[in-house]
Amino acid sequence: MRLLGVIGYLAVLIKAICESWVDVVKRSINGEIHPQVIEIESIINNPTGLVLLSWSITATPGTLVIDLIPEERKLKVAVISPRSREDIVPFEPYIKKIFD
């Protein structure tokens, strides 16, 4: 089950990075940048899983984790434009499969 989680995680992460890269380029050209900070509560219980989630969000263009509160499973994420929780953490269920 963990191997499937790793494969799914990598596939979704690569897709998210590519889509976000295109989005950031478009927004940079059009000047449609409206930064904000969003607080996300994670479904991941494992501290290492939370760190991987934080890294994954930061590796995705247009997003940056600025704070991680592991005891509350919360992350504060800076984004260049308003977006849904699902758009920020599409790989979260796969990380949960790996670590929980």
UniProtKB/Swiss-Prot annotation:
Keyword field: Cell membrane, Membrane, Transmembrane, Transmembrane helix
Entry superkingdom: Archaea
InterPro entries tied to this protein: Cation_antiport_E
Subcellular location(s) per record: Cell membrane
GO cellular component: plasma membrane
Membrane spanning residue stretches: 5-25, 49-69
Cell membrane as UniProt keyword: yes
PANTHER family attached to this UniProt entry: NA(+)/H(+) ANTIPORTER SUBUNIT E1 (PTHR34584), NA(+)_H(+) ANTIPORTER SUBUNIT E1 (PTHR34584:SF1)
Entry protein name: Uncharacterized protein MJ0953
Species in which this protein is naturally found: Methanocaldococcus jannaschii (strain ATCC 43067 / DSM 2661 / JAL-1 / JCM 10045 / NBRC 100440)
